[in-house]
Amino acid sequence: MSQYMILIYEDEAGYENATPELLGEVMEAHNQFAAGVEQLGGKLMGGAALQPGTTATSLRGSDVTDGPFVETKEVLGGYYLVDAPDLDTALAVARTVPARFGGVEVRPVMTFE
């Protein structure tokens, strides 16, 4: 099995005025995603939601800047790390990630021997 990082990019504006009901729906969708990974041939190794992009601090050399590197509508909001036998399986898993206000990126994790 190989590891794949599923990066979740979303427009944070979708959550700015979110009701408790919407936030509950989002959490339930992520719980259902986590429960279904093994049925698709993968194994969920970890994951987390990130604080809003406004809380980011970026470093470039000795320069420290508040906020993310790039001004963009969609920001990295969370990730999942999955074990999967191949990229096709990782993509099948990624298609089920609830990214209501954006999309996902799948990247293989490098291994060093």
Protein language model regions, located:
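Conserved, structured core segments of small domains
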Residues: 1-113
